[in-house]
């Protein structure tokens, strides 16, 4: 059994994905340290579910004053899990935690490229953003 840890910003972009075999303080610390190192600044808020592993990890990093926990507060992260869960069911599970980590990291980058917040843009803006995303995608595929 593996657990999916996902960090999502306020706009719904996936910041990072981590696949771990445990849901404990050490795993929570690993994700938080990875994010703090990658982005080099503390977040405005850290919203999590009621898992008790987050509070000690935030305390160890000195960001416990930013930590908000509770039911329904982390809906953005939970909703970003849904496509992954559907895809995982279709693929009959991943063969290993490593293959899940590689796939999900690549998928997050592609998702962020094509994730246009449609309800906040006009049709014209949406078409322009979508065309830019497709151009980027074609460049990446051609380089590979």
Task: State the predicted function of each range.
Residues 62-71:
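Short hydrophobic/aromatic-enriched beta-strand-loop microsegments
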Residues 90, 101-144:
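C-terminal domain-tail junction helix/linker
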Residues 52-62:
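Short, aromatic/basic amphipathic alpha-helical patches
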Residues 70-86, 95, 100:
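RNase H-like two-metal-ion nuclease catalytic core shared by retroviral integrases
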Residues 7, 12, 32, 46-49, ...:
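Mobile genetic element proteins and their domesticated derivatives, centered on retroelements
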Residues 19-23, 41, 47, 94-99:
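Conserved, non-catalytic sequence blocks in retroelement Pol enzymes and Pol-derived host proteins
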Residues 43-54, 71:
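Acidic/histidine-rich, metal-coordinating catalytic segments
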Residues 1-42:
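RNase H-like nuclease fold core
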